[in-house]
Every structure is written in structure tokens, then in C-alpha cells.
């Protein structure tokens, strides 16, 4: 639990630093050092080094899968701080507090990825979502940001109520909050247990913006400050999916035949709605919001298959999707025009940035030789083993083909259209380009040698 202790400590530290009057550069450097230490701490824990072994009444226990996911999340978080840390200053005056909230969110990530009690799962999700409400509405001068925060809070509270009701029904059916005892006693499910299971399923589907519980996503992502939208759309979504997979694998694995068809239906619906609606978007920010819904559909295939390849696919999807989306949003944050036309002629103005964006978009589309292609392949392979798997996989492949169209609209704007007269592009610093180049290289390397990441699941 190295990361839990360090994240909590650094979150409190960033709160006190805000009172010291330090410069933005110093605050940003301290935050980057903290996130780098979180990443190194997960690597150290994988090698057996623990600062302190927390027990917490055996309500959470970290396994190899959780550690690998946390290493991916903290590594991407470090890159996120390098790319977007400076842009947080443009949101408001509470610069240090933004970093503090993100560190507290990482505390929630640890609980979501290590819970063995339904209460700890609930606590972890709330530790993640409450700071997100604040970050969404952090641009207090912007009415869209305020509206997005209110929508997110109200709908999130409704989703939390569903989860609590589900946990209560499961406790009433089994007399325990322990996920391991639920799986041991779930040979013959009762109506009470099934009711709790589906309430939790629907609640978590809302958290990951799976259809038909996705309706909040475009407005919230569009209204939130862009610098925080990238964090919400990547690390938060990935961590929620990893917890989703852990819950249904550990607690409800023996009831797989009961909920599997529902997971498949939600995956198909999410893929169709996300991809079809993304086609009609003119704003790149809203396009990425609907794209994130479609990507949630692919991640849902891992839950639907929940067998060989599902965990490997989830880890690879977490890395490829997070890296590509963080890179695209970091560039989008600095653009003057968020529409697709705003990218017209970018390849002539700055071919290096355009090339990196092209790699990221190709990865999101699932083009071969990128990490996104192998991530989708693992998910499709996992789905094939499920009931009606072939039908679901065919629909998923068709929707992946649709996604190629709207991602290529951005590529077309960058490479095959001239910039509008008077259009101005931001100047990207050398350090910013170096970090983006590193992300593009990671996407390509993982697309060719995924074992560099996946072997940590077993060794």
C-alpha cells in the first residue's frame, strides 16, 4: 500500500503548500515529484518492498493485477502532470489545491483496485468522485463549468444511491460485505442477491459512462475545464473499469451466466451509441467525449468475456487509451479553436505535433502497429469465449470501422486542408514536444512489444 500512503501524504502536503505562497513553477515541480514517487512506489511494491503493510480489518488486499494497473495509472498521471500541469493555472487561483485533489483521487484508485469488501469499494468510488465534482466546476467564472458540475453531482448522487441500495440488498441476502464470502455462498442466487447485483451493475455502468447511462458524459466533459476533462476521460474511467472487473470476477464470478448477457448488451449499445453520435460532432472536445463512450464499450467487452485475455486486455487498454487521450487533450487545451476546422493546416504549421496527434488518433482507431490495435484485439478475443460472443464481436468490429471515419476527419483537417485565413496556432515548447514524443513512442512500442508491459502481470 505504498501508493495509498504516499498519495494521502502528498495530497495533504499540496494543501499546506498553497498557504506558503510558493510560485506556480515550484508547486508544479513538487506535484510532479510526488506523482513520480507514486509510480516508483508501485514498481517497488511489485518487487516486494512495502513502506507499511496496511490491514484495515482485511477489507482490501492488493494483488498483482491491481499493482500493474496502479503503475499504469500513476505513470500516465506523471505524464499528465508534465503536459498539463502548467495549464491548470489558467483555470483559477486555487492552483495547488487542484494537484491536492488529484492526489486524493489516487487514494481512491488504490481502494477501487484492492477492495475485498463492498464497503471499501463504495468508499473508494466516493473518494474518487467527490474531488471530481470540484474539479469539474473549478472554472467558477464559466457558467458551462458550473452547469457541468451540478449535473455531474446530481446524477452521481443518484448513481451512488443505487450502489448503496445494491450493497444493502447483497448484505441482506448473504449477511456479509466480503466479496470472497459472497462468492463462496452464491451457489443458488436469491432474488435479493440478484437485485443487489443488478443495482450495482447499473451504478457502475453510470460511473464508466456506458450506455444507456452515458447521457451525462458529453455535457460534463464539454463543460469541465479541458485540462481536467482529459484526466476524467482517461485515468478515472480506466480505474472504474478495473474495479468493475474486479468486483464481478471476485464476488459474482459464479453467477456469470446471470449477468453476462446484460454486460454484452450494454457493451453493444455503448459501442453503437458512442460511435454513431461521434460521427456528427464538429467540436473535437465533444467528439472525444462520445469517443470515450465508444471506448467504454470496448472495455465492457472485457467484463463480458471475463476469461483468458480479459485482464491483459484491460491493462493494455488502460495504457494505450490513457496515453493517446492525454496527449490529444493536452494539445487541445492550448488550441484557440476546438472545432475540427480549427485543426486545418496544422501539419504545415507544426508537422511534429501533427505527427504525434496522428499516432494517437490511429491508436484510438485501433490501426495495426499501435497499442490500441492490440488492446482491441485482446478485448475481442476475450468476448469470443462468451455466449453469443461471435455476434458481439462482429458488431464491435463494424463499430471500430465507424470510429476510423471520425478519427480520420481530424487527420484530414491537419494534413489535407489549408488553414483558414488569419488562423493562429499556439507555439508549443520543446519540453512539451519531448513529452508528447515519449508518449507516441510508448504507443508504438507497446503496439509491437506488448509483453514489455503484460509480463508484469505474472513476473
Regions found by a protein language model. Name each.
Residues 1-459:
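Alpha-helical transmembrane segments of multi-pass membrane proteins predominantly involved
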Amino acid at each position: 500500500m505504498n501508493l495509498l500512503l504516499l498519495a494521502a501524504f502528498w495530497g495533504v502536503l499540496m494543501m499546506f503548500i498553497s498557504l506558503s505562497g510558493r510560485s506556480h513553477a515550484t508547486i508544479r515541480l513538487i506535484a510532479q515529484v510526488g506523482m513520480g514517487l507514486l509510480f516508483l512506489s508501485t514498481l517497488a511494491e511489485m518487487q516486494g518492498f512495502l513502506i507499511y503493510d496496511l490491514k484495515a480489518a482485511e477489507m482490501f488486499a492488493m494483488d498483482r493485477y491491481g499493482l500493474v494497473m496502479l503503475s499504469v495509472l500513476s505513470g500516465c498521471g506523471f505524464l499528465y502532470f508534465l503536459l498539463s500541469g502548467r495549464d491548470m493555472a489558467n483555470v483559477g487561483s486555487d492552483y495547488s489545491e487542484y494537484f491536492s485533489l488529484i492526489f486524493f483521487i489516487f487514494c481512491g484508485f488504490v481502494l477501487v483496485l484492492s477492495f475485498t469488501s463492498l464497503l471499501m469499494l463504495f468508499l473508494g468510488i466516493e473518494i474518487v468522485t467527490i474531488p471530481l465534482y470540484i474539479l469539474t466546476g473549478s472554472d467558477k467564472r464559466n457558467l458551462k463549468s458550473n452547469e457541468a458540475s451540478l449535473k455531474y453531482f446530481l446524477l452521481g448522487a443518484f448513481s451512488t444511491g443505487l450502489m448503496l441500495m445494491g450493497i444493502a440488498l447483497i448484505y441482506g441476502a448473504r449477511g456479509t460485505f466480503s466479496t470472497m464470502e459472497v462468492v463462496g455462498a452464491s451457489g443458488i442466487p436469491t432474488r435479493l442477491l440478484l437485485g443487489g447485483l443488478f443495482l450495482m451493475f447499473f451504478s457502475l455502468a453510470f460511473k464508466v459512462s456506458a450506455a444507456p447511462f452515458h447521457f451525462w458524459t458529453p455535457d460534463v466533459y464539454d463543460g469541465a475545464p479541458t485540462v481536467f476533462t482529459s484526466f476524467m476521460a482517461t485515468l478515472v474511467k480506466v480505474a472504474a473499469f478495473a474495479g468493475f472487473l474486479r468486483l464481478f470476477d471476485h464476488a459474482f464470478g459464479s453467477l456469470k451466466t446471470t449477468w453476462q448477457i446484460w454486460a454484452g448488451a450494454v457493451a453493444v449499445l455503448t459501442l453503437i451509441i458512442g460511435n454513431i453520435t461521434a460521427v456528427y460532432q464538429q467540436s473535437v472536445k465533444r467528439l472525444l467525449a462520445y469517443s470515450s463512450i465508444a471506448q467504454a464499450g470496448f472495455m465492457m467487452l472485457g467484463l463480458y468475456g471475463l476469461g483468458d485475455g480479459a485482464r491483459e486486455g484491460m491493462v493494455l487498454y488502460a495504457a494505450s487509451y490513457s496515453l493517446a487521450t492525454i496527449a490529444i487533450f493536452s494539445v487541445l487545451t492550448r488550441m484557440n479553436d476546438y472545432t475540427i476546422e480549427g485543426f486545418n493546416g496544422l501539419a504545415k504549421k507544426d508537422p511534429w505535433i501533427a505527427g504525434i496527434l496522428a499516432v494517437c488518433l490511429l491508436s484510438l482507431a485501433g490501426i495495426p502497429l499501435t497499442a490500441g490495435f492490440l488492446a482491441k484485439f485482446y478485448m475481442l478475443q476475450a468476448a469470443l469465449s462468451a455466449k453469443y460472443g461471435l455476434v458481439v464481436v462482429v458488431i464491435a468490429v463494424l463499430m471500430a470501422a465507424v470510429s476510423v471515419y471520425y478519427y480520420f476527419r481530424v487527420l484530414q483537417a491537419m494534413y489535407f486542408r489549408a488553414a483558414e485565413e488569419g488562423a493562429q496556432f499556439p507555439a508549443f515548447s520543446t519540453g512539451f514536444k519531448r513529452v508528447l514524443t515519449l508518449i507516441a513512442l510508448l504507443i508504438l512500442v507497446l503496439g509491437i512489444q506488448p509483453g514489455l508491459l503484460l509480463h508484469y502481470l505474472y513476473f
